[in-house]
Amino acid sequence: MNNTIYKTALFLGLMLNTVNAQVINWANAGKEKHILNANIGAEYGVVFGLGYAYKLNHKLFPMTVGAEFSIPSGNTLLDDYKAKAGANVRWIKVHDFQFSTRVQGVFRRFENENAAIANFGLDMAGVVGYYRPKWFGGVELGFDKAIVTHFKHSEHYQEIYPEVKNGWYEPATGGNFYYGVQGGYTFRDQDIYLKFGNVVSQDFKTKPLLPFYVQIGYNYKL
């Protein structure tokens, strides 16, 4: 049974490389409260995403709360997807240098001919950047962790391995550290940004099938 879980978890590892969080220019806060986001990127494949954030203009610690949804390109819609919800807080501002952190709960689903896998996890990241009203750039370090995972094996797989069992399993299946750079340009009530970087598993020894991520995104503020 342990071997079965391990083999199935390898498929899940393709989904852990998910770094499509919204990028914000903290120096261009404005009075807008709503941020709509669309993005496209390459993680474990080509990924399309949409997001919404509500901005809280706290003078000391400005923050956004929101949700995101992404899906990879594929033949069957909603076989694989990821949903995230959480908060992004700017903690420190020294002249034009700013530091922020992001914490999001994550739900992922992945399905192939052997199993349908779903997990709940946590994505945490910190960004140090230089922010101007018209442009910004920074570096990001984060950790994406799968905490508890549900396995539902296909009938075909159960015929081959009749001892396999469906259900929730813990401890955590695994996680990835990711690090990279990001930058963007702001005009009026809109942002265009690019982010890219590398991914490594939590044991610091192995890398995912695609050990890097790239994303292009667009924000519209209302």
Residues covered by each model-derived region:
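Outer-membrane beta-barrel domain signature
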Residues: 25, 37-43, 72-78, 111-117, ...
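Cleavable N-terminal export/targeting peptides
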Residues: 1-28
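Short glycine/proline- and aromatic-enriched beta-strand/turn motifs that initiate or cap beta-hairpins
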Residues: 21-74
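Outer-membrane beta-barrel transmembrane domain signature
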Residues: 115-204, 220-222
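Transmembrane beta-strands of outer-membrane beta-barrel pores
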Residues: 40-44, 54-56, 69-73, 89-91, ...
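Extracytoplasmic loops and strand-loop junctions of Gram-negative outer membrane beta-barrel proteins
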Residues: 32-36, 108-110, 161-167
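Residues that define the transmembrane beta-barrel architecture of outer-membrane proteins
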Residues: 32-34, 44-48, 79-83, 116-122, ...
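Membrane-embedded beta-strand positions of outer-membrane beta-barrel proteins
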Residues: 36-40, 63-67, 99-103, 124, ...
